[in-house]
Amino acid sequence: MSTSTATTSVITSNELSLSGHAHGHGHAHQLHQHTHSRLGVGVGVGILSDASLSPIQQGSGGHSGGGNTNSSPLAPNGVPLLTTMHRSPDSPQPELATMTNVNVLDLHTDNSKLYDKEAVFIYETPKVVMPADGGGGNNSDEGHAIDARIAAQMGNQAQQQQQQQQQTEHQPLAKIEFDENQIIRVVGPNGEQQQIISREIINGEHHILSRNEAGEHILTRIVSDPSKLMPNDNAVATAMYNQAQKMNNDHGQAVYQTSPLPLDASVLHYSGGNDSNVIKTEADIYEDHKKHAAAAAAAAGGGSIIYTTSDPNGVNVKQLPHLTVPQKLDPDLYQADKHIDLIYNDGSKTVIYSTTDQKSLEIYSGGDIGSLVSDGQVVVQAGLPYATTTGAGGQPVYIVADGALPAGVEEHLQSGKLNGQTTPIDVSGLSQNEIQGFLLGSHPSSSATVSTTGVVSTTTISHHQQQQQQQQQQQQQQQQQHQQQQQHPGDIVSAAGVGSTGSIVSSAAQQQQQQQLISIKREPEDLRKDPKNGNIAGAATANGPGSVITQKILHVDAPTASEADRPSTPSSSINSTENTESDSQSVSGSESGSPGARTTATLEMYATTGGTQIYLQTSHPSTASGAGGGAGPAGAAGGGGVSMQAQSPSPGPYITANDYGMYTASRLPPGPPPTSTTTFIAEPSYYREYFAPDGQGGYVPASTRSLYGDVDVSVSQPGGVVTYEGRFAGSVPPPATTTVLTSVHHHQQQQQQQQQHQQQQQQQQHHQQQQHHSQDGKSNGGATPLYAKAITAAGLTVDLPSPDSGIGTDAITPRDQTNIQQSFDYTELCQPGTLIDANGSIPVSVNSIQQRTAVHGSQNSPTTSLVDTSTNGSTRSRPWHDFGRQNDADKIQIPKIFTNVGFRYHLESPISSSQRREDDRITYINKGQFYGITLEYVHDAEKPIKNTTVKSVIMLMFREEKSPEDEIKAWQFWHSRQHSVKQRILDADTKNSVGLVGCIEEVSHNAIAVYWNPLESSAKINIAVQCLSTDFSSQKGVKGLPLHVQIDTFEDPRDTAVFHRGYCQIKVFCDKGAERKTRDEERRAAKRKMTATGRKKLDELYHPVTDRSEFYGMQDFAKPPVLFSPAEDMEKVGQLGIGAATGMTFNPLSNGNSNSNSHSSLQSFYGHETDSPDLKGASPFLLHGQKVATPTLKFHNHFPPDMQTDKKDHILDQNMLTSTPLTDFGPPMKRGRMTPPTSERVMLYVRQENEEVYTPLHVVPPTTIGLLNAIENKYKISTTSINNIYRTNKKGITAKIDDDMISFYCNEDIFLLEVQQIEDDLYDVTLTELPNQ
């Protein structure tokens, strides 16, 4: 492939996926006496659009002795045959950023149906019945078909070949072709991916414009006449002659393996005929053999396809005729007037300009196509090779559209059994998962016996009841493999474990290209300190239900060429260090491969029942460095050993030999999977290494993480899931069965296991990694875990983004806190398998879902206990003052609701400019300084409010997830250092509040309640915080503790259910410290901008600066807040009478003492009672540490005071209260009302001339500002539009209204309201006093 920006190549076929079939055994070398190569780019594209999914069976194979070698049924260059086109909702966005005015044809269709036809049929391997006739010789088996080209070459050799093939299963051929317009990807000669950008018809020829991974544009021509070949095309074809591979086995027979290009047709073109737009079909090869005898005569008539073969030197060219069925191109699909004007690269973008109309476009980068799926499609993932034969252990299944079979094939199809049903099966009415179950879920017949090794099969293990049967088959396989290995040490021995009843043998080049096909998106850099070259290999078996999350569907043993016979491709170089002739284990690592040696590389894929992704696992063929490469026999006793190179399993182009390859393990339901030889599934991002999906979209901490080991991890808890990584080495020790559980073991057992690992290290000197202690629950068969590294998740802290940033929906931070939080934890709703938000995008917190494993004494437990301290004996709970330390462990993530409607609150102070987006916004305020809080409401059509007056409780809370006891201790600690017992934590300015209805209630020392009408206008209240953030630090020099200003709004003032909850994170400084802190951060921000050289913009790292702080909407409405009032103050209130002082109802089931009554009264504020046994002793309110009492209240009306109330109702009848003991209270006592003095509120009654009913104006505070706000609330006249307010008394004297007049002379007076407009949007208001009626 040229390295220029524009490369032109030629494909001389409209059938780009055509490949030949070679069925030879004894005379395979005679069949392939010439090496072949297809001219132009190695295309062989076997990827279909959703118009028709038709499988192609390709490849060549050779058979020798008792060992069989079958080529992988890949496209000519190793590309998997089938995939889907549409994007999955879970797949990442394409890296190709901008497409402007693009004309791209056939990238996808807009049809809702999967296929063009109404019915979709699933077939077994089509058994083509052809009589023994014609040039093919006598065919003793009618179920065996021979390609016409092969039959023409074989002559009399066919009979001998067929007799030798009768030793194995018959391998019928069924080539199902598809049109050129179904091709959606081009692959280069070395397996590099080429992304199709456009396909045009120019001068009657197809031109495919593609772009490779290096950003180069390649123009591929598909010609129909060899005379149109360019001069440089022959040079390209000559350069590709060396792609053919030849391997010598012990029998001395020449066996040709498939190369990136097919062997049978080096040049495929059209001969004769005048129509250059002829599409060939392969229908006639399935007709009677009599027609093949007339192939030469048909070729002379015109329109025949000529298969040209030659030797490596380009001489001895032979042409083989073949029949064709001419067809016309669809003129609507391929229009000759389409062309592209300009294509250029702009950084990471590819911009395409065209003069034609824009078409539907879906272009994907890398290997994203392998994971694409849309509704109504059958999921056929990339990397799923389809077998060319029917193996003894299972039935390969193909899915084709109705009518996709060529003419002459349908009548030869024989009905078969697929999962107990006769094929073909009409699946047009089935769902996607049901069709996928047919496609991937065909099970081996119960009567099938394993007669050969190396047979091809694609077996899906998806039912639990077949485990026992498959284990028996595995034992039989292993015994036969071991025997055959001893008899034929040079043969390729399958090492298929349970979950695969066969193997697919592919060449190294095909395997390498398949790895390149499935590329993964570049993940964040792996910053771990672990060594990267773990030469570990072993067989692990996962036991127990629900232990692993994947199910193995395919196992491939790929024989690779030896060092001497390896093709000289730059991307395919495998260091062969194994000699299958040796049955003894080599521990020195110095064994070198002989010219006849082979290396078996394992290719395994995993899928899940009902899932949408398939996981490919294989070795990464690249040059092994150093003399310490793994060495050992391929298949020790037991037949379970698999040799892997010590490279990353990731096949993507971005993965190097020392990088980790990670696959996304999403939407994988837990369940008992089959046991497997090797497992590799890992989460894609670095911070997910310590968490595993819980099966329902959430995440639970992974109890263990296996590194550098071939170990399956099992969770003792049913349904548990573990995410781990696998690394592979080039050597195979004897199979060791290992099961790692999360059960806790004593330190002594861990030391013993560590000693055992050290002994293994001494025996295997080429393994240099230091083995860490691992946990081993029950070792099967007495074997020890092989290089398993367990890492606990509980003690780890990962700094993750929060949902606030928009990019941190996966934010989870494990905490060291181990106490049961009950209902006081922000994550009380975050149980395993439960998501916090409604759309399931925010994972749960770790606090409430860690493994419940008991901690005994002072052991270093691998998991963190959530069991109560009474059962543990010890806890690791942190003291409350330690929360002042701003380390990563203190960062918490609070589930939030993001919406633009409903209640919204703002703190009138700017936010910090140094807070990163992954953290919550924070606001700096000064102690004792009043700051405004604006309460607003935007109409929410989905959740409208019913009442005009709502109650909002503003309180100061701790941000950290403390227990209520710890919060009370912190407030008591602060209160004990104050000069007055009446010192409040949260104060409110009653005079300068706006838009409130009634008076401000002091619920507790750290909470107040206000009433306002959200349907009329917004409200504003000024609050001041009287404590410092550093007041809760245990020592000087520690950063202050962040606090929350939390607002709970109740739709009905009498309701106890929270309608909306919001919070704002603050830090409180003293002596203008907030301003100093803000200035320092601004200077640092300016300095960062001057020196910013990073890849990410600073604006993307930090929250944008705003003039006021918006409250976050919380999801958790159930957690009751902790309200604090000192016990000393409560004793005085209790002496006056608790029932009347609090104005709340008693709990009729309480024990009668004052403490319990007052306790229940405050709980009734939020609708919680303590009569239930499970809440006693753990009250959500716990207002103090020693005695329970009610708070001191200045104003005790818990409901709006606009009801008819006598002014003297606030005078309490002391005799009535003291004469009745509290224990005699039966039903709840009537609530006593207490009205504030007139100095803090004024009521005016006004009406206009055309009105008969007066309108009350609540003037709070009793000032002109309060009057302006009252007029604005009632008459919708803006306060800024009122120029003057006058009062005309009964004597006719008019005067301007001032504060004193309102406070002392206007209470409950009656006025006539007159509004006079003096200018545009400027009014004078006159209140004319009316005589009392």
From Swiss-Prot:
Biased composition (Gly residues): 59-68, 626-642
Biological-process GO terms, alphabetical: chitin-based cuticle development; chitin-based embryonic cuticle biosynthetic process; epithelial cell morphogenesis; fibroblast growth factor receptor signaling pathway; ganglion mother cell fate determination; membrane organization; nervous system development; open tracheal system development
Basic and acidic residues bias locations: 520-532
Pfam assignment, any one: CP2
Molecular function terms, GO-annotated: DNA binding; DNA-binding transcription activator activity, RNA polymerase II-specific; DNA-binding transcription factor activity; DNA-binding transcription factor activity, RNA polymerase II-specific; protein homodimerization activity; RNA polymerase II cis-regulatory region sequence-specific DNA binding; sequence-specific DNA binding
Transcription is among the record's keywords: yes
Family under the similarity heading: Belongs to the grh/CP2 family. Grainyhead subfamily.
Function: Transcription factor that binds a CNS-specific regulatory element of the Dopa decarboxylase (Ddc) gene. Also interacts with sequences adjacent to other transcription units, including Ultrabithorax (Ubx) and engrailed (en). Activity in vivo may be required only at high levels transiently to activate the expression of Ddc in the CNS.
Database matches in PANTHER family: PROTEIN GRAINYHEAD, TRANSCRIPTION FACTOR CP2
Official protein name in the record: Protein grainyhead
Lineage per the UniProt record: Eukaryota, Metazoa, Ecdysozoa, Arthropoda, Hexapoda
